[in-house]
């Protein structure tokens, strides 16, 4: 059953956006690899002092395996000034008639 993954990264949002621009090809390559390992949806969102990922994966195990073995993500995190390890939460999607 798919899971929604929320990841919180303490980071300077402007610095992160700069890395998105300078390493766009790396972001695209990581996304392509993620799709082969079970990623269904992905996006970044930001708030004051933090960047979040909102993903949907085939399973929590698929996400954890991908994230722990992906060599480019730690480089991007370091260049983005991420402070400390990210925090991940996993949620089960609920079926309801108002989903869109």
Q: Where in this protein do the model-derived segments appear?
A:
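Short S/T/G/P-rich N-terminal loop/turn motif that feeds into the first structured element of a domain
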Residues: 1-71, 82-100
């Amino acid at each position: 059953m798919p899971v929604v993954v929320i990841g919180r990264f303490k980071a300077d949002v402007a610095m992160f956006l700069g890395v998105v621009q300078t390493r766009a090809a790396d972001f695209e390559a990581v996304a392509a690899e993620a799709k082969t390992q079970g990623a269904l949806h992905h996006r970044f969102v930001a708030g004051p002092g933090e960047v979040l990922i909102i993903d949907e994966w085939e399973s929590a195990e698929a996400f954890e395996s991908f994230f722990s073995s992906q060599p480019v993500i730690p480089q991007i995190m370091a260049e983005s000034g991420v402070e400390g390890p990210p925090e991940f939460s996993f949620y089960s999607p609920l079926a309801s008639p108002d989903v869109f």
